[in-house]
Amino acid sequence: LSKQMNAKILDTIRRIEANKDFTNPTYMRLLTPHFYEQHICRFPADEWPDPVKRTFKHLNSVIYTQMQGPSEFGIAGNLANWDVSDLLKNITTPTLTIGAKYDSMDPEFMKWMSTQFPNGSYLYCANGSHMCMYDDQQTYFKGLIKFIRAVDKGEKKVVLD
């Protein structure tokens, strides 16, 4: 994702990260429009839905940083080496993974993950980000409702396109 950023802005962000100055107000001032508004929820932050605003307002940064690490451009926290992909085959409940074009998570990885569940299905939101339930609602809810209805009818895998 960093490759998509303006080089000057990315350079400033990298410099702040190299100095471990994550509380620098410039850091969040740059991350908000150039990362969060592009890859988390694709609206200006002041127009984010109320649940998103509340989430960010009440985010426990100590726990988030412990798990993710201080940077949004790589995992350096407790999750850095956490991998349970070999256990996904044991989850037999119909499972839907969702990927989106602008997501901070790789949609191809989400698609791959759906193939690891015995009853996995995948939904791609072509106009969405990490919170595609807000910024690609048509695709997200059409796919989610189709998945729920199919599972309710007893289907294990659902083709969503």
Where are these regions (language model features)?
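Conserved loop-alpha-helix segment in the C-terminal half of the alpha/beta-hydrolase fold
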Residues: 85-128
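Short, glycine/charged-enriched secondary-structure capping and boundary segments
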Residues: 1-2, 110-114, 137-140
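Short catalytic/ligand-binding loop motif for oxyanion handling, primarily in non-cytosolic enzymes
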Residues: 44, 105-106, 132
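Alpha/beta-hydrolase
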Residues: 4, 8-89, 93
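Non-transmembrane alpha-helical segments in soluble domains
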Residues: 32-36, 114, 141, 145-148
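Catalytic active-site module of serine/aspartate enzymes centered on a nucleophile-bearing elbow/loop
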Residues: 119-161
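Short histidine/acidic/glycine/proline-rich micro-motifs that form metal-
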Residues: 18-22, 104, 130
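The C-terminal output helix
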Residues: 1-8, 152-154
